[in-house]
Amino acid sequence: MFTVLNQVSGKSFKCGDEESVLDGALSNGFNFPYGCQNGFCGQCKAVILNGEIDYDGEVPSVLSADDIDSNMALLCQCKAKSDLYIAVDELDSLAAIEVRSMPCRVEQINHLNHDVIQLILKIPGAQSLQYLAGQYLDLEHSDFDSRYYSIANAPTNSNLIELHIRLVDDGKLTNFIFNSLAPKSILRIEGPKGSFFLREESECPIIFIAGGTGFGPVKAIIEHLINIGSQRKVYLYWGVRSEVDLYSNLPSEWSEKYTNISFIPVLSEANETWDGNKGYVHDSVIKDFEDLTGFEVYACGPPVMVNAAAKSCLEHQLVKENFFSDSFEYANVSNDDA
């Protein structure tokens, strides 16, 4: 066992040499920022001030040359090979959030379009799940490997959890959900997890960049903003391939009902009848906002989209600390198990 000391907080924890530094931190109750836990989103970057680490294989591609020169490491992928002295900002908002495992009942299965299902789960009345809008959970079934899904509804007193699940062609779990799962079935969930959530202490205008079912956690955050009566200016950019992939009318309803919410759908494979924004969703953001000084950006979707959005936004004066992301990466299990 090695000792990992965080310069920022002055607190330390023990970490085994066969677990990631992030796993060691989380198992000891430390609220380090993280997202996908697969090495794609980059949310768990930290500075290694002293000590040795190792990766199982190549250095993760999400670490740039500048990151490596600055002794940045990806805590979800690296393992301690000596005592470590690191620098990472812990998240106070997560201090009261407890990761729990519990059974839940399938309440509703609603097809939102050809390849997205809205799954409504009911938590037993004797239990509760405290979470922050934007976080995700593990969905577990005894016959399949678990999968991460973002919670798509804002925290309320309700014991219902909403998930948006896209069909993965070769995915065993998603095919089971689409074709065999029935109401009243029992599944298990473990969560909440992740550091993709609203920074409520800020008054900055917000740009949401959602790709596909990345709309789910964004929906939860916007619902939370509405529930708390926030007047922060919100710009929602939702990028999909074609119009049929815009599987919810809620963004249009929000923009009509609330003067502080604007909705900009972006199609990458638009047909000739589409007169809205076309191309990559992050390009539409930069076209509308050449200077992102004073904004917060929340991006959720495929890693390629999130990484492109981060690069573009930082090149247009967004402060690095104001970019928050969650990458939907299916590498936590193989395609055969998804």
Q: Can you say where each PLM-predicted feature lies in the sequence?
A:
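Short, charged beta-turn/beta-strand-edge "cap" motif at the junction between a beta-strand
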Residues: D92, D143-D145, G191-F196
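FNR/FR-type flavoprotein reductase catalytic core
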Residues: R166-A338
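N-terminal pre-ligand scaffold of iron-sulfur
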Residues: M1-F32
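Iron-sulfur (Fe-S) cluster-binding segments and ferredoxin-like electron-carrier domains
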Residues: S20, G24-P33, Q43-D92
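Ferredoxin-reductase
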Residues: E98-I186, C204, V240-S242, V266-A270
